[in-house]
């Protein structure tokens, strides 16, 4: 019962975090940065400063679809960020470039996350089926196998946390030192990036509590046998 309550609480945190990301992004999308740079210009400048001239910056459709692709080595920014001159645009653009800088120096957590992604992607798809099959058939072996596979997905989300926090830290340091934001604009940057980081924390908690719930089901079933 406790784990169910914790999972519900984590889900609530996840929904709240998503709301905060969208609301803060929209709020500071309306506040133009004093530097007058677009998100694309900000990203390009930071990449060039760090010698990453061969890493392109491309627009991508959607909102909050921004990401760095380590396979193709490209920074993709949603159109509101790519073309925007707001505090939100500069914050998100610099965060994604932070991942490119991590890649440049072979930041351990990023490299590990990239290497295990194919395995985790497979495990995430199969684990729920094993849990369902195990509970319907009363098979502890299937549940146990599901736990092993789901553990990989939880591990992936946990190592995502330092990757995202580090990228945000790099982003704030660079845009302040280079003068992309000034004075009280830093407060807006902190709110945009902190809300985004919270979504990863919430997702990790949801996965962790789900894993613990299935571990308890497995242990209780074993005791009954």
UniProtKB/Swiss-Prot annotation:
Enzyme kind, highest EC tier: hydrolase
Compartment(s) of residence: Cell membrane
GO cellular component annotations of the record: plasma membrane
Sorted UniProt keywords: Cell membrane, Hydrolase, Membrane, Metal-binding, Metalloprotease, Protease, Transmembrane, Transmembrane helix, Zinc
EC number, UniProt record: 3.4.24.-
Residues at which Zn(2+) binds: 95, 99, 103
GO MF terms held by the record: metal ion binding; metallopeptidase activity
Topology class, membrane: Multi-pass membrane protein
Pfam families: Zn_peptidase_2
Major localization class: membrane
Transmembrane portions of the chain: 116-138, 140-162, 192-212
Catalytic-site annotation from UniProt: 96
GO biological process: proteolysis
Protein name from the UniProt record: Putative membrane protease YugP
Species whose genome carries this gene: Bacillus subtilis (strain 168)
Gene (UniProt): yugP
